[in-house]
């Protein structure tokens, strides 16, 4: 039976290249464009929603998602309002991907948020935003936020609301099952993904939710070269710098690296584990990663579509 797959890519550029990158990715045929964010990080990063706002002004078709927005560091009313604005600006193409963060404690210290509260804060925020998008006169009594008779207008273009995806690792599983419209794990193997899908289905069923309505996405760092060793080396160096740890062995386990054929074969393993939407994050030297989009568009994605037709 044919499998419908979607392919997205994260922004690889900085500064003035945002608009150019968005146009290029849409013209190459990608289904979605994604922007991550860190308020404070080891290298320069733009605000995710502002980046997507720029992209919305120069594209017409691609979905525009955050991968991910650090929800515990934001007020849910402000995020809900910003996402509605993006949804209108893009004529209904916005996706809000949220996560709890925590891998860079300086962000939480600077924002005055306790790291141990990041999960419960995100759970409350997700509930609040969905209600603000779909209801008027919202009253909510929580541990972190209290709303009394609050409405935001206009409502989103998408009905009932923009998809709310959950990023992360193990902690993202129950959050997705209970509150999410989609799952975006990262640093996962096919085996981990298959097990995660099973857990989401079980938790969603118990909560009275239909797990078939939860979109199955994967955020995957990727590096493409003439050999596995070269691609793995590029990715290990880049990820090691970003996450301040040794990725020499981890790069063989989590990212999608290798020749175009090897990348396609690894992605097919994820398809068989349940992935239906790939978010590809180029990982490697800046002068090499810019070409990854073309390689995916011309070689890897057509191969996967053929295998799953």
Residue ranges and their predicted role:
Residues 2-13, 73-139, 186-187, 191-198:
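Flexible, glycine-rich active-site loops centered on histidine and acidic residues
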Residues 5-11, 33-35, 64-66, 94-98, ...:
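Hydrophobic faces of well-ordered beta-strands that scaffold small-molecule active sites
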Residues 5-16, 69-76, 160-168, 250-261:
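Active-site mouth loops of central-metabolism enzymes
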Residues 7, 27-29, 86, 96, ...:
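Residue-level signal for nonpolar/aromatic packing positions in well-ordered secondary structure
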Residues 14-25, 82, 167-175, 259-269:
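Short, acidic/polar
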Residues 23-27, 52-61, 83, 87-93, ...:
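Acidic (Asp/Glu)-rich catalytic clusters
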């Amino acid at each position: 039976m044919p499998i419908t797959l979607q392919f997205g890519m994260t922004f690889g550029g900085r500064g003035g290249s945002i608009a150019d990158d968005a146009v290029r990715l849409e013209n190459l045929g990608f289904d979605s464009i994604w922007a991550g964010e860190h308020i404070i990080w080891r290298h320069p990063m733009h605000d995710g929603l502002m980046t997507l706002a720029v992209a919305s002004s120069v594209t017409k078709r691609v979905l525009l998602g955050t991968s991910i927005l650090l929800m515990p560091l934001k007020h849910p009313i402000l995020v809900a309002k910003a996402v509605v604005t993006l949804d209108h600006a893009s004529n209904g193409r916005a996706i809000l991907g949220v996560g709890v963060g925590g891998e860079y404690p300086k962000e939480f210290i600077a924002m005055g948020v306790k790291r141990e509260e990041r999960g419960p804060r995100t759970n409350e925020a997700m509930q609040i935003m969905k209600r603000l998008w779909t209801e008027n006169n919202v009253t909510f009594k929580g541990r972190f936020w209290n709303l009394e008779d609050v409405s935001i207008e206009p409502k989103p273009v998408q009905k009932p609301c923009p998809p709310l995806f959950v990023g992360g690792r193990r902690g993202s599983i129950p959050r997705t099952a209970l509150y999410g419209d989609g799952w975006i794990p990262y640093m996962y193997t096919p085996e981990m993904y298959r097990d995660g899908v099973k857990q989401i289905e079980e938790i969603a069923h118990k909560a009275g939710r239909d797990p078939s309505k939860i979109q199955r996405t994967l955020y995957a760092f990727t590096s493409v070269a003439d050999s596995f060793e070269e691609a793995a080396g590029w990715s290990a160096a880049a990820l090691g710098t970003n996450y301040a740890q040794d990725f020499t062995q981890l790069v063989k386990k989590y990212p999608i690296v290798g020749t175009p054929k090897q990348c396609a074969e690894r992605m097919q393993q994820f398809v068989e584990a349940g992935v239906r939407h790939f978010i590809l994050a180029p990982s490697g030297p800046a002068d090499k990663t810019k070409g990854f989009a073309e390689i995916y568009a011309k070689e890897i994605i057509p191969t996967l579509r053929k295998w799953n037709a």
